Amino acid sequence: MVICLHCPDQDDSLEEVTEECYSPPTLQNLAIQSLLRDEALAISALTDLPQSLFPVIFEEAFTDGYIGILKAMIPVWPFPYLSLGKQINNCNLETLKAMLEGLDILLAQKVQTSRCKLRVINWREDDLKIWAGSHEGEGLPDFRTEKQPIENSAGCEVKKELKVTTEVLRMKGRLDESTTYLLQWAQQRKDSIHLFCRKLLIEGLTKASVIEIFKTVHADCIQELILRCICIEELAFLNPYLKLMKSLFTLTLDHIIGTFSLGDSEKLDEETIFSLISQLPTLHCLQKLYVNDVPFIKGNLKEYLRCLKKPLETLCISNCDLSQSDLDCLPYCLNICELKHLHISDIYLCDLLLEPLGFLLERVGDTLKTLELDSCCIVDFQFSALLPALSQCSHLREVTFYDNDVSLPFLKQLLHHTALLSQLIYECYPAPLECYDDSGVILTHRLESFCPELLDILRAKRQLHSVSFQTTKCSKCGGCYIYDRHTQCCRFVELL
Protein backbone atom coordinates (compact mmCIF):
# COMPACT_ATOMS: atom_id res chain seq x y z
CA MET A 1 0.00 0.00 0.00
CA VAL A 2 1.38 3.38 -1.03
CA ILE A 3 0.15 6.59 0.59
CA CYS A 4 0.67 10.18 -0.53
CA LEU A 5 0.46 12.67 2.34
CA HIS A 6 -0.11 15.52 -0.08
CA CYS A 7 -3.17 14.22 -1.92
CA PRO A 8 -4.56 17.40 -3.46
CA ASP A 9 -8.23 17.50 -4.27
CA GLN A 10 -7.19 18.75 -7.66
CA ASP A 11 -3.94 19.54 -9.38
CA ASP A 12 -3.94 23.32 -9.60
CA SER A 13 -0.90 23.25 -11.88
CA LEU A 14 -2.99 21.62 -14.57
CA GLU A 15 -5.75 24.22 -14.48
CA GLU A 16 -5.81 26.62 -17.34
CA VAL A 17 -7.97 29.67 -17.71
CA THR A 18 -9.19 29.97 -21.25
CA GLU A 19 -11.16 32.76 -22.81
CA GLU A 20 -13.74 32.07 -25.43
CA CYS A 21 -13.18 34.25 -28.42
CA TYR A 22 -16.27 35.10 -30.40
CA SER A 23 -15.83 35.24 -34.14
CA PRO A 24 -18.72 36.74 -36.08
CA PRO A 25 -19.99 34.63 -38.98
CA THR A 26 -18.59 35.43 -42.41
CA LEU A 27 -20.79 36.59 -45.26
CA GLN A 28 -20.44 33.12 -46.79
CA ASN A 29 -21.68 31.47 -43.60
CA LEU A 30 -24.63 33.84 -43.41
CA ALA A 31 -25.48 33.12 -47.05
CA ILE A 32 -25.29 29.35 -46.48
CA GLN A 33 -27.50 29.53 -43.40
CA SER A 34 -30.04 31.62 -45.31
CA LEU A 35 -30.00 29.15 -48.22
CA LEU A 36 -30.50 26.13 -45.97
CA ARG A 37 -33.59 27.66 -44.38
CA ASP A 38 -35.31 27.49 -47.78
CA GLU A 39 -35.18 23.77 -48.62
CA ALA A 40 -36.74 24.04 -52.07
CA LEU A 41 -34.39 26.83 -53.11
CA ALA A 42 -31.36 24.99 -51.70
CA ILE A 43 -32.18 21.79 -53.60
CA SER A 44 -32.77 23.63 -56.86
CA ALA A 45 -29.46 25.46 -56.45
CA LEU A 46 -27.42 22.26 -56.21
CA THR A 47 -27.03 21.88 -59.98
CA ASP A 48 -25.25 25.25 -60.24
CA LEU A 49 -23.54 25.26 -56.85
CA PRO A 50 -19.73 25.71 -56.99
CA GLN A 51 -18.00 22.46 -56.09
CA SER A 52 -15.98 24.11 -53.35
CA LEU A 53 -19.17 24.88 -51.39
CA PHE A 54 -20.49 21.31 -51.34
CA PRO A 55 -18.50 20.11 -48.27
CA VAL A 56 -19.30 23.29 -46.32
CA ILE A 57 -23.02 23.16 -47.08
CA PHE A 58 -23.16 19.41 -46.47
CA GLU A 59 -21.59 19.84 -43.04
CA GLU A 60 -24.01 22.64 -42.11
CA ALA A 61 -26.97 20.58 -43.31
CA PHE A 62 -25.70 17.52 -41.45
CA THR A 63 -25.09 19.41 -38.20
CA ASP A 64 -28.41 21.30 -38.25
CA GLY A 65 -30.52 18.36 -39.43
CA TYR A 66 -31.64 19.53 -42.88
CA ILE A 67 -32.29 15.96 -43.95
CA GLY A 68 -34.12 16.83 -47.16
CA ILE A 69 -31.09 18.74 -48.42
CA LEU A 70 -28.74 15.93 -47.37
CA LYS A 71 -30.84 13.46 -49.33
CA ALA A 72 -30.67 15.67 -52.42
CA MET A 73 -26.92 16.28 -52.20
CA ILE A 74 -25.87 12.62 -52.34
CA PRO A 75 -26.93 11.94 -55.98
CA VAL A 76 -25.15 15.09 -57.23
CA TRP A 77 -22.02 14.93 -55.06
CA PRO A 78 -19.27 16.28 -57.36
CA PHE A 79 -16.33 14.51 -55.70
CA PRO A 80 -15.29 10.85 -55.76
CA TYR A 81 -15.15 10.66 -51.96
CA LEU A 82 -17.35 11.62 -49.02
CA SER A 83 -16.15 11.06 -45.47
CA LEU A 84 -18.31 12.01 -42.49
CA GLY A 85 -15.35 12.14 -40.11
CA LYS A 86 -16.17 12.86 -36.47
CA GLN A 87 -19.68 13.94 -37.46
CA ILE A 88 -20.63 10.26 -37.63
CA ASN A 89 -20.89 10.34 -33.81
CA ASN A 90 -23.83 12.75 -34.19
CA CYS A 91 -25.62 10.75 -36.88
CA ASN A 92 -29.14 9.89 -35.69
CA LEU A 93 -31.55 7.50 -37.35
CA GLU A 94 -33.35 10.17 -39.39
CA THR A 95 -30.09 11.53 -40.78
CA LEU A 96 -28.95 8.01 -41.65
CA LYS A 97 -32.24 7.31 -43.44
CA ALA A 98 -31.91 10.51 -45.46
CA MET A 99 -28.42 9.62 -46.64
CA LEU A 100 -29.41 6.07 -47.55
CA GLU A 101 -32.41 7.38 -49.48
CA GLY A 102 -29.99 9.60 -51.37
CA LEU A 103 -27.95 6.52 -52.25
CA ASP A 104 -31.14 4.81 -53.44
CA ILE A 105 -31.75 7.70 -55.81
CA LEU A 106 -28.18 7.40 -57.05
CA LEU A 107 -28.60 3.67 -57.65
CA ALA A 108 -31.89 4.17 -59.46
CA GLN A 109 -30.46 6.59 -62.01
CA LYS A 110 -30.41 4.93 -65.41
CA VAL A 111 -28.07 7.59 -66.75
CA GLN A 112 -25.33 8.91 -64.51
CA THR A 113 -25.32 12.70 -64.32
CA SER A 114 -22.12 14.38 -65.43
CA ARG A 115 -21.86 16.12 -62.10
CA CYS A 116 -22.03 13.14 -59.76
CA LYS A 117 -18.62 11.50 -59.26
CA LEU A 118 -19.27 9.80 -55.93
CA ARG A 119 -17.43 6.49 -55.64
CA VAL A 120 -16.73 6.14 -51.91
CA ILE A 121 -18.89 7.03 -48.93
CA ASN A 122 -17.05 6.56 -45.70
CA TRP A 123 -18.74 6.29 -42.31
CA ARG A 124 -15.39 6.32 -40.55
CA GLU A 125 -13.68 8.69 -38.12
CA ASP A 126 -10.46 9.05 -40.10
CA ASP A 127 -10.95 12.79 -40.58
CA LEU A 128 -11.83 15.47 -38.07
CA LYS A 129 -14.57 16.91 -40.23
CA ILE A 130 -16.58 16.18 -43.33
CA TRP A 131 -14.15 15.84 -46.20
CA ALA A 132 -14.47 15.43 -49.92
CA GLY A 133 -11.64 13.75 -51.77
CA SER A 134 -10.46 15.57 -54.84
CA HIS A 135 -8.18 12.91 -56.32
CA GLU A 136 -10.46 10.62 -58.21
CA GLY A 137 -9.63 7.01 -57.55
CA GLU A 138 -6.26 7.74 -56.00
CA GLY A 139 -5.69 5.27 -53.18
CA LEU A 140 -9.42 4.71 -52.77
CA PRO A 141 -11.50 1.56 -53.04
CA ASP A 142 -14.08 1.71 -55.79
CA PHE A 143 -17.41 2.94 -54.50
CA ARG A 144 -19.40 3.08 -57.69
CA THR A 145 -18.64 0.68 -60.50
CA GLU A 146 -20.60 -0.21 -63.56
CA LYS A 147 -20.82 -3.73 -64.89
CA GLN A 148 -21.12 -3.56 -68.64
CA PRO A 149 -23.98 -5.56 -70.17
CA ILE A 150 -23.33 -8.45 -72.49
CA GLU A 151 -23.00 -7.09 -75.98
CA ASN A 152 -26.14 -7.34 -78.17
CA SER A 153 -28.30 -8.48 -75.25
CA ALA A 154 -31.82 -7.20 -75.65
CA GLY A 155 -33.05 -4.76 -73.01
CA CYS A 156 -29.85 -4.95 -71.02
CA GLU A 157 -28.89 -2.12 -68.67
CA VAL A 158 -25.74 -1.14 -66.86
CA LYS A 159 -25.67 -2.74 -63.42
CA LYS A 160 -24.47 -0.36 -60.72
CA GLU A 161 -22.77 -1.45 -57.53
CA LEU A 162 -21.93 0.55 -54.43
CA LYS A 163 -19.39 -0.08 -51.73
CA VAL A 164 -20.18 1.50 -48.37
CA THR A 165 -17.39 1.61 -45.79
CA THR A 166 -17.98 2.14 -42.09
CA GLU A 167 -15.36 2.62 -39.40
CA VAL A 168 -16.91 0.50 -36.69
CA LEU A 169 -20.02 -1.49 -35.95
CA ARG A 170 -20.62 -1.57 -32.21
CA MET A 171 -22.65 -4.50 -30.99
CA LYS A 172 -23.32 -4.18 -27.27
CA GLY A 173 -25.60 -7.07 -26.48
CA ARG A 174 -28.18 -6.06 -29.06
CA LEU A 175 -27.87 -3.92 -32.15
CA ASP A 176 -28.96 -0.31 -31.83
CA GLU A 177 -31.69 1.06 -34.06
CA SER A 178 -29.37 2.81 -36.53
CA THR A 179 -27.12 -0.22 -37.00
CA THR A 180 -30.14 -2.47 -37.47
CA TYR A 181 -31.54 -0.13 -40.11
CA LEU A 182 -28.23 0.06 -41.97
CA LEU A 183 -27.87 -3.73 -42.02
CA GLN A 184 -31.44 -4.27 -43.18
CA TRP A 185 -31.05 -1.61 -45.88
CA ALA A 186 -27.87 -3.24 -47.18
CA GLN A 187 -29.37 -6.74 -46.97
CA GLN A 188 -32.38 -5.70 -49.05
CA ARG A 189 -30.01 -4.35 -51.71
CA LYS A 190 -27.42 -7.11 -51.51
CA ASP A 191 -27.22 -7.38 -55.30
CA SER A 192 -25.99 -3.79 -55.59
CA ILE A 193 -24.71 -2.85 -52.12
CA HIS A 194 -21.55 -4.18 -50.53
CA LEU A 195 -21.15 -3.13 -46.89
CA PHE A 196 -17.59 -3.11 -45.62
CA CYS A 197 -16.73 -2.69 -41.94
CA ARG A 198 -13.10 -2.10 -41.05
CA LYS A 199 -13.61 -2.44 -37.30
CA LEU A 200 -16.12 -4.58 -35.40
CA LEU A 201 -16.74 -4.28 -31.67
CA ILE A 202 -18.75 -7.02 -29.98
CA GLU A 203 -19.48 -6.26 -26.33
CA GLY A 204 -21.68 -8.84 -24.75
CA LEU A 205 -23.18 -11.28 -27.21
CA THR A 206 -26.54 -11.91 -28.77
CA LYS A 207 -25.96 -14.77 -31.18
CA ALA A 208 -28.90 -13.75 -33.36
CA SER A 209 -27.37 -10.28 -33.77
CA VAL A 210 -24.01 -11.72 -34.78
CA ILE A 211 -25.67 -13.92 -37.38
CA GLU A 212 -27.58 -10.88 -38.66
CA ILE A 213 -24.38 -8.83 -38.99
CA PHE A 214 -22.53 -11.43 -41.03
CA LYS A 215 -25.44 -11.85 -43.42
CA THR A 216 -24.57 -8.38 -44.71
CA VAL A 217 -21.07 -7.36 -43.63
CA HIS A 218 -18.17 -8.79 -45.62
CA ALA A 219 -16.14 -10.62 -42.96
CA ASP A 220 -13.07 -10.78 -45.18
CA CYS A 221 -12.75 -6.96 -45.02
CA ILE A 222 -12.77 -6.67 -41.22
CA GLN A 223 -9.33 -5.46 -40.19
CA GLU A 224 -9.86 -4.96 -36.45
CA LEU A 225 -12.00 -7.04 -34.09
CA ILE A 226 -12.67 -6.22 -30.44
CA LEU A 227 -14.33 -8.89 -28.30
CA ARG A 228 -15.31 -7.55 -24.90
CA CYS A 229 -17.25 -8.97 -21.96
CA ILE A 230 -18.11 -12.32 -23.50
CA CYS A 231 -17.72 -15.90 -22.32
CA ILE A 232 -15.21 -18.37 -23.69
CA GLU A 233 -17.89 -20.67 -25.12
CA GLU A 234 -19.29 -17.67 -26.99
CA LEU A 235 -15.81 -17.15 -28.38
CA ALA A 236 -16.09 -20.69 -29.75
CA PHE A 237 -19.39 -19.69 -31.41
CA LEU A 238 -17.50 -16.96 -33.28
CA ASN A 239 -14.85 -19.32 -34.67
CA PRO A 240 -16.59 -19.88 -38.04
CA TYR A 241 -16.73 -16.11 -38.54
CA LEU A 242 -13.11 -15.68 -37.47
CA LYS A 243 -12.12 -18.11 -40.21
CA LEU A 244 -13.71 -15.77 -42.76
CA MET A 245 -11.75 -12.72 -41.56
CA LYS A 246 -8.90 -13.07 -44.02
CA SER A 247 -7.81 -9.44 -43.54
CA LEU A 248 -7.91 -9.35 -39.73
CA PHE A 249 -4.94 -7.26 -38.65
CA THR A 250 -5.75 -6.47 -35.01
CA LEU A 251 -7.51 -8.63 -32.40
CA THR A 252 -8.42 -7.44 -28.91
CA LEU A 253 -9.69 -9.85 -26.25
CA ASP A 254 -10.96 -7.80 -23.33
CA HIS A 255 -12.58 -9.34 -20.25
CA ILE A 256 -13.26 -12.80 -21.65
CA ILE A 257 -14.64 -14.84 -18.78
CA GLY A 258 -14.62 -18.59 -18.30
CA THR A 259 -18.19 -19.16 -17.19
CA PHE A 260 -21.29 -19.96 -19.17
CA SER A 261 -23.54 -16.97 -19.71
CA LEU A 262 -26.87 -18.78 -19.85
CA GLY A 263 -27.68 -19.68 -16.27
CA ASP A 264 -24.75 -21.99 -15.50
CA SER A 265 -22.41 -20.11 -13.17
CA GLU A 266 -20.00 -22.98 -12.61
CA LYS A 267 -16.46 -22.41 -13.78
CA LEU A 268 -15.24 -24.41 -16.70
CA ASP A 269 -12.68 -27.09 -15.96
CA GLU A 270 -9.18 -26.77 -17.41
CA GLU A 271 -9.72 -29.53 -19.95
CA THR A 272 -12.80 -27.80 -21.37
CA ILE A 273 -11.02 -24.44 -21.52
CA PHE A 274 -8.06 -25.99 -23.33
CA SER A 275 -10.41 -27.70 -25.77
CA LEU A 276 -12.21 -24.43 -26.55
CA ILE A 277 -8.96 -22.51 -27.02
CA SER A 278 -7.52 -25.21 -29.27
CA GLN A 279 -10.48 -24.72 -31.62
CA LEU A 280 -9.44 -21.15 -32.43
CA PRO A 281 -8.86 -20.87 -36.17
CA THR A 282 -5.60 -19.85 -37.81
CA LEU A 283 -5.40 -16.07 -38.17
CA HIS A 284 -3.41 -15.58 -41.35
CA CYS A 285 -2.83 -11.82 -41.31
CA LEU A 286 -2.91 -10.93 -37.62
CA GLN A 287 -0.19 -8.44 -36.66
CA LYS A 288 -1.45 -7.03 -33.35
CA LEU A 289 -2.81 -9.02 -30.41
CA TYR A 290 -4.15 -7.32 -27.27
CA VAL A 291 -5.20 -9.48 -24.33
CA ASN A 292 -6.68 -7.80 -21.25
CA ASP A 293 -8.36 -9.39 -18.25
CA VAL A 294 -8.59 -12.90 -19.65
CA PRO A 295 -8.17 -15.16 -16.59
CA PHE A 296 -8.05 -18.49 -18.42
CA ILE A 297 -5.04 -17.47 -20.47
CA LYS A 298 -2.91 -18.78 -17.58
CA GLY A 299 -1.22 -21.96 -18.75
CA ASN A 300 -2.72 -21.59 -22.24
CA LEU A 301 -0.71 -18.76 -23.79
CA LYS A 302 1.04 -21.16 -26.14
CA GLU A 303 -2.32 -22.26 -27.56
CA TYR A 304 -3.31 -18.66 -28.23
CA LEU A 305 -0.07 -17.95 -30.06
CA ARG A 306 -0.43 -21.17 -32.04
CA CYS A 307 -3.27 -19.55 -34.01
CA LEU A 308 -0.94 -17.02 -35.61
CA LYS A 309 0.27 -17.59 -39.14
CA LYS A 310 2.47 -14.53 -39.59
CA PRO A 311 4.92 -13.14 -37.03
CA LEU A 312 3.25 -10.66 -34.69
CA GLU A 313 4.32 -7.03 -34.58
CA THR A 314 2.54 -6.16 -31.32
CA LEU A 315 1.85 -8.34 -28.29
CA CYS A 316 0.11 -6.67 -25.36
CA ILE A 317 -0.94 -8.63 -22.27
CA SER A 318 -2.42 -6.89 -19.23
CA ASN A 319 -4.45 -7.71 -16.12
CA CYS A 320 -3.95 -11.46 -16.57
CA ASP A 321 -2.34 -14.27 -14.61
CA LEU A 322 0.61 -15.98 -16.28
CA SER A 323 2.29 -19.21 -15.29
CA GLN A 324 5.94 -20.14 -15.54
CA SER A 325 5.09 -22.36 -18.51
CA ASP A 326 3.60 -19.33 -20.28
CA LEU A 327 6.87 -17.44 -19.94
CA ASP A 328 8.91 -20.53 -20.81
CA CYS A 329 7.19 -20.90 -24.18
CA LEU A 330 7.80 -17.33 -25.35
CA PRO A 331 11.37 -17.66 -26.69
CA TYR A 332 10.37 -20.68 -28.77
CA CYS A 333 7.26 -19.25 -30.44
CA LEU A 334 8.33 -18.54 -34.01
CA ASN A 335 5.36 -16.24 -34.56
CA ILE A 336 6.60 -13.66 -32.04
CA CYS A 337 10.26 -13.69 -33.03
CA GLU A 338 9.91 -10.40 -34.96
CA LEU A 339 8.04 -8.34 -32.37
CA LYS A 340 8.22 -4.57 -32.65
CA HIS A 341 6.12 -3.82 -29.57
CA LEU A 342 5.97 -5.88 -26.37
CA HIS A 343 3.71 -4.63 -23.57
CA ILE A 344 3.22 -6.55 -20.33
CA SER A 345 1.46 -4.67 -17.55
CA ASP A 346 -0.55 -5.19 -14.36
CA ILE A 347 0.59 -8.80 -14.11
CA TYR A 348 2.03 -10.25 -10.90
CA LEU A 349 5.41 -11.62 -11.94
CA CYS A 350 7.40 -11.54 -8.72
CA ASP A 351 7.01 -15.31 -8.15
CA LEU A 352 8.25 -16.24 -11.64
CA LEU A 353 11.66 -16.63 -13.24
CA LEU A 354 12.16 -14.05 -15.99
CA GLU A 355 15.07 -15.72 -17.80
CA PRO A 356 12.71 -16.84 -20.63
CA LEU A 357 11.67 -13.23 -21.09
CA GLY A 358 15.35 -12.35 -21.39
CA PHE A 359 15.79 -15.02 -24.06
CA LEU A 360 12.82 -13.53 -25.93
CA LEU A 361 14.45 -10.08 -25.82
CA GLU A 362 17.57 -11.62 -27.36
CA ARG A 363 15.51 -13.02 -30.23
CA VAL A 364 13.70 -9.76 -30.96
CA GLY A 365 16.69 -7.50 -30.38
CA ASP A 366 16.85 -6.49 -34.05
CA THR A 367 13.17 -5.56 -34.33
CA LEU A 368 11.87 -4.41 -30.93
CA LYS A 369 10.97 -0.71 -30.77
CA THR A 370 8.87 -0.40 -27.61
CA LEU A 371 9.08 -2.36 -24.37
CA GLU A 372 6.67 -1.93 -21.47
CA LEU A 373 6.98 -3.89 -18.25
CA ASP A 374 4.73 -1.87 -15.96
CA SER A 375 3.09 -2.67 -12.62
CA CYS A 376 4.45 -6.22 -12.58
CA CYS A 377 6.01 -6.19 -9.07
CA ILE A 378 9.38 -7.15 -10.58
CA VAL A 379 12.25 -7.09 -8.08
CA ASP A 380 16.00 -6.62 -8.50
CA PHE A 381 17.12 -10.19 -9.10
CA GLN A 382 14.38 -10.75 -11.70
CA PHE A 383 15.28 -7.59 -13.60
CA SER A 384 18.91 -8.69 -13.58
CA ALA A 385 17.99 -11.60 -15.85
CA LEU A 386 16.83 -9.12 -18.49
CA LEU A 387 19.76 -6.71 -18.50
CA PRO A 388 22.18 -8.47 -20.90
CA ALA A 389 19.50 -8.86 -23.56
CA LEU A 390 18.02 -5.41 -22.93
CA SER A 391 21.26 -3.63 -23.76
CA GLN A 392 21.33 -5.46 -27.11
CA CYS A 393 17.91 -4.16 -28.22
CA SER A 394 19.51 -1.41 -30.25
CA HIS A 395 16.33 -0.29 -32.05
CA LEU A 396 14.33 0.47 -28.91
CA ARG A 397 12.59 3.84 -29.04
CA GLU A 398 10.47 3.63 -25.89
CA VAL A 399 10.86 1.80 -22.58
CA THR A 400 8.65 1.98 -19.49
CA PHE A 401 9.28 0.07 -16.28
CA TYR A 402 7.29 2.07 -13.71
CA ASP A 403 5.61 0.58 -10.65
CA ASN A 404 8.14 -2.19 -10.04
CA ASP A 405 10.02 -2.87 -6.80
CA VAL A 406 13.65 -2.00 -7.50
CA SER A 407 16.30 -0.59 -5.21
CA LEU A 408 18.40 2.49 -5.89
CA PRO A 409 21.61 0.49 -6.56
CA PHE A 410 19.84 -1.72 -9.06
CA LEU A 411 18.12 1.23 -10.75
CA LYS A 412 21.57 2.70 -11.37
CA GLN A 413 22.64 -0.62 -12.87
CA LEU A 414 19.57 -0.64 -15.12
CA LEU A 415 20.34 2.88 -16.32
CA HIS A 416 23.91 1.93 -17.22
CA HIS A 417 22.41 -0.63 -19.62
CA THR A 418 19.72 1.58 -21.14
CA ALA A 419 22.29 4.35 -21.53
CA LEU A 420 23.71 2.24 -24.37
CA LEU A 421 20.43 2.44 -26.32
CA SER A 422 21.04 5.48 -28.49
CA GLN A 423 17.63 5.55 -30.21
CA LEU A 424 15.53 5.91 -27.06
CA ILE A 425 13.24 8.93 -27.14
CA TYR A 426 10.89 8.04 -24.28
CA GLU A 427 11.87 6.44 -20.96
CA CYS A 428 9.90 5.97 -17.75
CA TYR A 429 11.54 4.30 -14.76
CA PRO A 430 10.21 3.33 -11.33
CA ALA A 431 11.06 5.46 -8.33
CA PRO A 432 13.41 3.33 -6.19
CA LEU A 433 12.23 1.69 -2.98
CA GLU A 434 14.28 4.21 -1.01
CA CYS A 435 11.65 6.83 -1.94
CA TYR A 436 9.09 5.25 0.42
CA ASP A 437 9.17 4.90 4.19
CA ASP A 438 8.36 1.67 6.04
CA SER A 439 4.63 2.48 5.90
CA GLY A 440 4.66 3.06 2.16
CA VAL A 441 4.46 6.84 2.38
CA ILE A 442 5.97 8.56 -0.68
CA LEU A 443 9.00 10.69 0.23
CA THR A 444 9.22 13.18 -2.62
CA HIS A 445 12.31 14.93 -1.27
CA ARG A 446 14.27 11.71 -1.65
CA LEU A 447 13.16 11.26 -5.23
CA GLU A 448 14.22 14.84 -5.99
CA SER A 449 17.63 14.20 -4.45
CA PHE A 450 18.21 10.90 -6.30
CA CYS A 451 17.11 11.86 -9.80
CA PRO A 452 19.85 14.33 -10.84
CA GLU A 453 22.48 11.62 -10.33
CA LEU A 454 20.32 9.08 -12.15
CA LEU A 455 19.94 11.40 -15.12
CA ASP A 456 23.69 11.97 -15.19
CA ILE A 457 24.22 8.23 -15.75
CA LEU A 458 22.22 8.46 -18.97
CA ARG A 459 23.55 11.87 -19.98
CA ALA A 460 27.12 10.62 -19.83
CA LYS A 461 26.42 8.19 -22.69
CA ARG A 462 23.88 9.86 -24.96
CA GLN A 463 21.54 12.74 -25.59
CA LEU A 464 18.36 12.66 -23.51
CA HIS A 465 14.83 13.25 -24.75
CA SER A 466 11.88 12.37 -22.51
CA VAL A 467 13.07 10.72 -19.29
CA SER A 468 11.01 10.42 -16.10
CA PHE A 469 10.90 8.57 -12.78
CA GLN A 470 7.46 7.70 -11.43
CA THR A 471 6.26 6.59 -8.02
CA THR A 472 3.67 3.89 -7.45
CA LYS A 473 0.11 5.19 -7.46
CA CYS A 474 -1.19 6.49 -4.15
CA SER A 475 -3.69 4.08 -2.60
CA LYS A 476 -5.87 6.98 -1.42
CA CYS A 477 -6.18 9.26 -4.44
CA GLY A 478 -4.76 7.22 -7.31
CA GLY A 479 -2.21 9.89 -8.16
CA CYS A 480 1.54 9.63 -8.35
CA TYR A 481 4.63 11.83 -8.36
CA ILE A 482 6.77 12.14 -11.45
CA TYR A 483 10.24 13.61 -11.74
CA ASP A 484 11.33 14.41 -15.29
CA ARG A 485 14.41 15.99 -16.74
CA HIS A 486 12.57 19.06 -18.04
CA THR A 487 10.95 20.28 -14.80
CA GLN A 488 13.70 18.82 -12.56
CA CYS A 489 11.23 18.57 -9.70
CA CYS A 490 8.49 16.25 -8.47
CA ARG A 491 5.03 17.08 -9.76
CA PHE A 492 1.81 15.45 -8.74
CA VAL A 493 -0.20 13.81 -11.52
CA GLU A 494 -3.69 12.44 -11.01
CA LEU A 495 -3.87 9.28 -13.09
CA LEU A 496 -7.16 8.40 -14.76
Swiss-Prot record:
GO biological process per UniProt: negative regulation of apoptotic process; negative regulation of cell differentiation; negative regulation of DNA-templated transcription; oocyte development; positive regulation of cell population proliferation
Deletion phenotype: Expression of spermatogenesis-associated genes including Klhl10, Tekt2, Tdrd6 and Tnp2 are significantly up-regulated in the ovaries.
A single cellular component GO annotation: nucleus
Keywords attached to this entry: Cytoplasm, Leucine-rich repeat, Nucleus, Repeat
Localization, UniProt: Nucleus; Cytoplasm
Tissue expression per record: Expressed in the ovary, ovulated oocytes and preimplantation embryos (at protein level). Not detected in testis, liver, kidney, spleen, heart, lung and brain.
Subunit field text: Interacts with RALGDS (via Ras-associating domain). Interacts with HRAS (in GTP-bound form).
Protein name: Oogenesin-1
